[in-house]
Amino acid sequence: MFIGRERELNTLNELYNSGKFEFAVVYGRRRIGKTALINHFIENKDAIFFTGVESNAKQNLENISASIWEYTNGTAIDSAFVSFQAAIEYVFKLAEKKRIVLVLDEYPYVARATKSLASTLQLLIDRYKDTSKLMLILCGSSMSYMEDKVLSYKAPLYGRRTAQIKLLPFSFAETCRYFANYSPEEKALAYGIVGGTPQYILQFDDKRSIEDNVKNTFLNPMSFLYEEPVNLLKQEVREPAIYTAIITAIATGSSRMSEIASKVGEDANVCAMYIKSLINLGIITKETPYGQKESRRSIYSSIDNMFRFWYRFVPDNYSLIARGAADLVYSRIAPHLSEYMGKVFEDICAQYLWEQLLAGQCPISFSSLGRWWGTDEATREQAEIDIVGAQDKNTALVAECKWTNEKVDLAVLKTLIERSKLLGYKHVTYYLFAKSGFTQACIDEAEANQKLILVPYKQMS
């Protein structure tokens, strides 16, 4: 059953229904669901689907020829077109009479083996775009290649595409649709552990407990997720060992460049190059205090929940996992889950605020959200605010997010109010998010203060 991606499907269907030549670029990280999306889109449509392989031009030409002949004759035959230009031009001409979708999946594999492919496509698009009803879809997992060689203004295909779709992980709300049998708390835990990548979500069975799922995936040497982060890095980057060391450092608490470099044992400038690649892959993110531009106080954190969970808990327990001691390893992980979920809950709360804004239900019309941290000059102590979103230089919202088993009390609100003064906004709306709800005193305060909004987690899930 296909779940989600309604916006992307609508975009593809609008292109298809135009009846004229269309050229869409679909890209995103591995396991993100590109092929599943396209397969769902082309159901009941005239389509030729070709998947490139990491081989030479001859092999890929034979494969695309087979795909074309299978479409035209119903069966694949042995003869191949003499060139990619001949093969793709044949499809362009077929599409002069009827609507056809041509999908070139794993395009970077083919383009690397056939250096002239991009220029060939440019030539054919320019020649047939006014007469052919072809809908061409290029799909690729190599983010850097798709952005530099297909979408960049320097690329031969620049200016030819009519749409581009960058597939991102599912949001928390979208991910919850895969876990209908879970309680609200279990849904949050599942999202915090596997994130929003469809292939990772599918490894969890919502008819089994979170504990059983973790044991059967992350703590099982024969499971897909057990070696997935390392395997994915091997496919995407050179020197995966250094990348692994950097992600491990970040997942276990190092956030500043100097701390990461020290833990990895490499120069900070060297680490910066590797971190840039990890940011492009959507595995980590760079943060600066809200409202500031580039800052020496910038920090780095994991943006992909599955990577964060894996690097936080799996490497240190390799030996035990290899010996089948999943129960013992989970007993070591469990006490840290509440603390681990703190950052996940902040992300869930930020997503909730965006949903409220888009639904016209947020009192502050912010354009961005982020964390803020800095020094309280009065106390000389470090202060942090989980979420800040400004409407203008005078108006903002601030939020505190608590994933604990205790109800949030007035002390948390008072701390948030005091810290918000460090930002300098005149008009502030305060949000408190809580896994376990609020004390009566806190509820009474919210009823008396329209600038205070309490959001229990059960309201968000």
PLM feature segments, named:
Residues 1-331:
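Phosphate-binding site recognition
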Residues 290, 299-461:
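A cross-kingdom feature that marks ATP-driven nucleic-acid transaction machinery
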